[in-house]
Structures are given as C-alpha cells and as structure tokens.
Amino acid sequence: MNRSRRGFLFGAAASGASLAIVKSSAGAFGIAEQTASLRGRFLTHVSVVRVNQIEVTPTKNIGQDEAADNRPERIRSRRDAFARGCPDGKMTWAISWLALHDSRKEYQEARRLLAEYHHRYGDEVTFIPGGYFAPMYDTREHNRRTNHEALQMISTMVGGGYRPQCLVAGFMDAENQRHLAEDEGIHVCQGQIWSQHAIDNGDGDGGICYPYYPSREHYLKPAQGRADFIDCVCLDGWTCDFLAARRDGFKGGFNSRMGVGPIETVGNLGATAGRREMMDTTAMHFDTGQALNGFGFVTSIWETSIGHDEDLAWWLQAVRERWPDTKVITEGAFGLEWRKHNPDNSKLNYRFDEKGTGAPGSEKDLEIEWFMNREFRLALLHNWTKGDPPMVIDFTRYDLRAEEPRSPEREWSLMNVINQKGTRQQDKPVRISQLTPDDQRRIFAKYPELKRRA
C-alpha cells in the first residue's frame, strides 16, 4: 500500500459544497472559555527547501532526489506567488540539512535568496530536521546536536545577528522541544502533524490541533502543571478537514490529510473541487472556529518541489477577499503571539464544529464536533440530517500517564480510551452514556450542556 501523500491520487470527481457557518448543536455559538484574549484570524505558510524528498538523518535519505525541483527559479516562483496572494504577508522558509550543506551553485544561490527574503520582506528562515520525521529515524541526542548545528548555520547564513523564532519539524519529541526552549532560546516549534496516521513515514495522532505547551512526558500531551511544563508552544503543521482527518490513512479510498494542502485537494480532486475544499476547510476555522474560540488558525507546509504556486496565490487572494482582517504572519510570530496571551495551558478550551463539505471523505450528512482542553479531547459524530444521537469517536485523556517511544520507531501517537482512527479493538463509537461514570463526570464538569445529549 502506498502510504505517501504524493503517491495517492483520488480519481473520482468531487462535488464539494461550501461550508456554512453552523450553530453548534452543543448550544455553543457563544465563545468558549477563552484562551486568554487572543483574537483574530491567523494564517501561516511554510515553504520547504531541500535536496532529497525525506532526509531522515544527516546521512540517510528516503525517496527521490529533488534538487532540480528546488532550484533558485522555483524558490523565486514560490515567493512571487505568495506576494501575489498576500503582498504584505510574511512567510516561513524551512531549509533541510543537505540544502544547508550542498556546495552546488544552485544551493548557494538558494541560501542567498532565503537570507535576502528575510532582510527584504521579514520572512522567517529556519531549519527542518529529519524530513518531518526526525524522532522516527534518529535518537534524541543526535537530533539535539543536529538542531543546534543547523540553527547556528542559519544564523550565520542570514547574518545580522539573526535567530529563528521557531523550528519547523513535522514531528518533534518533548525532550527536544525542551532543549529548544532552554538551550536555544526558541519558544515555538511546529512539532506535530495533527491526526496523521498510516500516511508517509510517521504516525502521531492524539494531540490538540491548536497551540499548547507540551508535557515532558509526551509531545502530544498538554502540560498539566508546572512540574511537566515545557515553555515551547507546539503548533500543528497542516490544517485538515476534520471529517477526512478522522480516517486512518487512505481507509475507504479517501485521503485523511485532505484540507488546505494542494496535494490532497487540487492534485487529487482537480482545480475547481480542490480549491473549493481548501476554502471550505479554511472556513471551518475562520468562520465557525473563530466564533467559537475567539481566534482562528490555519496553517500548511508546502514543499517548494511540489509546485502549485498558482494555487497558493489563488488561495491567499481568496482568503484576503473573504476575511480581509486575516493576519498572514510567520510561524514563529504566531506562536509567540499566542504565548504572549497564555503563560500556561490552564485556559485551553478549543471547540470545533463541522458539517461535511461534500468532498470525498467529508460526508455532507455528517457533523463532527471537537472539544479540546488540558484534561482531554473529545470528538462527537452524528448524522445531522436524521437527528441521530452523537457518538463518541475519540476520547483521549491527558491526565493519564503518557510515555513516548524510547528509541526511534514509526508510532508516536497518544491513544488511550477511544481513538478516532479505529485501529484498536476498543476504538468502537459509543454514546457518552456508555463511557465509565468517572469519564462522564469528567466530561460533564467541563461541558454540562452535553448531559442532555448523552
């Protein structure tokens, strides 16, 4: 089975429908218990410059050589597309280990361009270790040393005392996020790929899709208090359609990573349906999500090698026309803005409510609701056209002890009571009333309005 995002092409035509702002059936169009006072709509775009498709360690590569697709003209094309879509925006560039070290004139020019973009536009330039999958392929200590050396090289490359405000990692273990904060002075890490499982080279479902401070126990667990607190804001890397994201890999012939990324949308569905899904997914956060949470956050990492520059320009233009107050800023700037309003996780209370868009894997007759806080995450699914009762498809408790793998391996998820992917015998959807009395009390203490829907 081809697990890669790029290798999956969905042949069927899509007939997606725009997502309307919906009133939460939990009675929650009032803003949830606020994550401090952060307000607004925020979009971050990351472009990756690399040599090999997946540089899992400094000395090991998986996948194809992409040097031809990362040449300077491709980098210029990407920046021009971003500027057409958002002339006053700032973006983040993530450069790989091999791209930092490659002596070919094309990569010398690429590095010069990235430094120029920082000085001219205020773009952020940072490091991407392990081709998104550093913990899956290398030890914590090796990754720490690699991060340290690469960040020093980037400071030298950009000059002027420059220091990145974040690390773009795909996945990054808790210990190395602690090192970023304490040793490198970096307090933002794109450190998880929310809901990713059975796709590409690493699995990591179980976390929160909006910012949080990770626990020393596990990078997907929000810190519970001072004892396990890591002062590094952990960010998701790709905003996905929540209904598509509940699936495991390509189960049922659908792509669980479908959202605002071009591979899973335009690449699989065609320009019309694909762009519609990109906007529908954006609306989940900038319409309903912003109303529920006080702010909306949409993010995606687009490798320079994949192209789709016209789709990037179109999407950014469409976002600015529909939500003109959107702030298009760097990854580090967004994380630090959230950090400014949140000294810890005590006010975490994110809520999301999506009715399907009609794109493949996002069924129009289904509604999914997510509740995410420091103590647990809860997902409810039901057929809203029939008035079916909500079923719990995910209940992950964060008050329980968690432990990361001790050595490199593929599986870095955090699963306990019920997980949305349905990969274990216990992952069967149930009514809230079928959970243990203790778990019901835990849920109702946070969301008493769910009692009538149990």
Give residue ranges: language-model regions.
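Surface beta-strand/loop "capping" patches
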Residues: K340-H382
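N-terminal secretory signal peptides
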Residues: M1-S4
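N-terminal export signals
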Residues: G7-A28
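Active-site beta->alpha N-cap acidic-glycine motif
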Residues: Q34-A115, G294-S300, I368-W370, A379-H382, ...
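Active-site-adjacent pocket scaffolds in enzyme catalytic domains
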Residues: A32, P164-Q290, P343-P360
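Acidic-aromatic substrate-binding/catalytic surfaces of carbohydrate-active enzymes
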Residues: N383-R453
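Catalytic grooves of carbohydrate-active enzymes
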Residues: R50, I54, Q64-E73, S77-G85, ...
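Metal-dependent polysaccharide deacetylase catalytic core of the NodB/CE4 family, i.e.
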Residues: G89, A94-F171, A227-E264, A291-E303, ...
